[in-house]
Amino acid sequence: MASLEDGTYRLRAVTTHNPDPGVGGEYATVEGARQPVKAEPNTPPFFERQYWQVTRNADGQYTIKYQGLNTPFEYGFSYDELEPNAPVIAGDPKEYILQLVPSTTDVYIIRAPIQRVGVDVEVGVQENTLVYKIFPVDGSGGDKAAWRFTRE
């Protein structure tokens, strides 16, 4: 599996069945510290809050940190709880597993590195908010949320 290079990216919400839906779309957008991360269009006033520093750690997992201007402290993809539909919070950056979607070069499933019997906890979108979704590990859950990582 190809690993993502460290760098600054925009993260566009796509799906595993439609990893390249064309023009437009919604991107991971920070609203503020301890606030849910939103999915917004890549237009003013949102686009300046859509830069994310993705860094691979020694254990092969990644942190996704907000890379905006004038941030008084470091925050990134985080969580208070990993329950179905709980929001992704802009907080103390947690580690994630990035799983490349087959037949793509820049589309990944973002998974929380936790052990739950028979399921994966993955980052998706619900009503313009990034949330944690539960999918069976056997692939029977259908179309999964995925993210196109566009290098900036």
UniProtKB/Swiss-Prot annotation:
Protein name: Clitocypin-6
Keywords: Protease inhibitor, Thiol protease inhibitor
Assembly behavior: Homodimer.
GO MF term set: cysteine-type endopeptidase inhibitor activity
Function of the protein: Binds and inhibits cysteine proteinases. Inhibits most strongly papain and cathepsin L, more weakly bromelain and cathepsin B while it is completely ineffective against cathepsin H.
Similarity section: Belongs to the protease inhibitor I48 family.
Superkingdom of this protein's organism: Eukaryota
